[in-house]
Amino acid sequence: AIGKMLKDKHGTDVRVLPAGNDVARLQPLRTGRAFASAMGAGVYFAQEGLFEFGSKEWGPQAVQLTLTTVDCNAGSLGVAADSGVKTVADLKGKRVGFVVGSPALNQNTLGVLAFANLTAKDVKVVEFASYGAMWKGIVNNDVDAAYGTTITGPAKEVESSPRGIVWPPTPPDDKAGWARLQKVTPFINPHLATCGAGISKEKPVQLSNYPYPIYTVYANQA
């Protein structure tokens, strides 16, 4: 949509470079191959030099936010309906996806688990090479849960698969749960999702969200 707007209003062609994790998203920007990157929470970690961005090769990055949004969708753990999971606490002992090199997805996952006082030790961690592969893992019954936005294409694919999809709620009136979640992911807040896979205005779900995507440039580009 943004590419079309730039083309229609400014005659600018946009070429999209696909990437499977946070480091891969930012690398083309760092090397000058791209002028902007659609990041997630990984941009916060890049700015602070945390997790994968805490290595000697990276360190704190002078990144700058240019555009973001909050809409009817939310970001949380999508879970295969046939797993029997109804609440976040039900994820104990289940297979939960993590993506190598993607601290945003992994920390967000840990934040949702913390809502129910769970950690990575309480679930079966299944690692994937990319976001898409992780969600495909639900369809293929290699994993039971994955973090993403409710409107993501892979979530729609899970919804239409034999496994189906549910989004265990994180109700805002659970103050203790939210205190634990925000201790892990302080940039995430309660949000009523009214659109997405298995979600509608008629069947909303109390989930969580943060401004996403975060279109990012380096400070010397702004």
Q: What is each residue range found by the language model?
A:
Residues T69, V88-D90, L207-P213:
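Short, flexible turn/loop "capping" segments at secondary-structure junctions
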Residues G11, N21-A24, T31-A34, P60-Q61, ...:
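Extracytoplasmic
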Residues A1-R15, C72-D144, I151-G153:
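Bilobed "Venus flytrap"/periplasmic-binding protein-like clamshell domains
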Residues G3-K4, R15-E57, V85-K86, G132-G137, ...:
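Pocket-flanking alpha-helical
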